[in-house]
Amino acid sequence: SRGLGDVYKRQELAPSGMNWGVGTWGENRQMMDILRRRIVADPDGVRNVIKQCHLTEHHMLVGGSSFKRLEVPAGVPDDLKGWYALREVYISPESTASVDVHSPQLTKRVQEDFLSLSPLYHLLRGAYEAIPPEEVDKMVQKMRR
């Protein structure tokens, strides 16, 4: 793992296409473990952050590889199980094919998308410091009983 510096805001513009979004740069086990602890400790808080981003309204996709056999604690709500199992995460537009690179609308759309993703970026960026690991580990053990 490269550490928490792997959380990014990204925009790419190339002759072959363009894209933008937020997420982790490759697999970051330490940060994702911390996010998993946060999901267990405060599922409503994590859900609220995700809802604040209006991913569907902004036509954003959540991507990333997942652990196939990771045991998800019984208390994790169904709508967060996919997030819990992620090895890495990135959120980007469904499609940018119809966006004209020379259009003033591009700047507006990228700005709006980054503003909408801000709560999720801050959740990922602050995952390590959000909850003391000792407290969360106790909660996880309690849920497994």
Name what the model sees in each region.
Residues 13-145:
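Charged, low-complexity intrinsically disordered regions
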Residues 3-8:
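Short, small-residue-biased leader/transition segments that mark boundaries at the very start
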Residues 1-2, 91:
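Short beta-strand element of the conserved SAM-dependent methyltransferase core
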